[in-house]
Amino acid sequence: GVGWVVFWAIKHAQKNNMTYKNFASEHGYEFDQAQGNDNYRDYSTNVTRNEKTVTLSQSPFVEKYANFTQYPFGHGTERKVAYVISGDYKNTPFQAFTYHFVGQDSDKSKPGGVFSIVLIQCPDTPRRQLTDQMFYENGFLCEYQQGNLNVETIHERIDHLRKLV
């Protein structure tokens, strides 16, 4: 029944939380659950709603961690930031987190969903060509993928970004 589903969702969120928390403490990184237990769901398909006009009150976590204009940021509604891991890896300040938003039918080119975000501080514009799922904004080089953040790939994704700087 519904009770079991809710119980499972809570257990699942707690398990995710522990995975991220353990990874952060193992490597001496900061961890912020942010909106990590906001009834968080794993969307494998695109999520859209038919909403033409939306007034957004930004979550403080979105303001703090996801204050960018380029896709997947700055679009849609119900923007959420969850499970933020931040620190220095090989002397490179970084942040990694799961980002979610609900897309709008009026803008099919920017589908909503769940994104795994890794970004590094990068004071100068990157010298190399960025691939599709990357952008440079506000002194950060950012790369995003579909799905929840996976701790197993954070370091390799940072290494990949470092090569572009």
Q: Where on the chain are the PLM-derived regions?
A:
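Transmembrane-cytosolic junction motif
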Residues: 2-27
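Generic hydrophobic/packing signal
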Residues: 20, 49-52, 154-157
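Hydrophobic, Leu/Ile/Phe/Ala-enriched alpha-helical segments that form helix-helix packing faces
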Residues: 20-28, 158-165
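Short glycine-aromatic motifs
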Residues: 26-30, 37, 133-135, 139-140
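Solvent-exposed, non-transmembrane helices and loops of integral membrane proteins
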Residues: 28-48
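Short Lys/Arg-enriched alpha/beta "domain-start" segment
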Residues: 33, 46-61
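Structured extramembrane domains adjacent to transmembrane segments
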Residues: 56-165
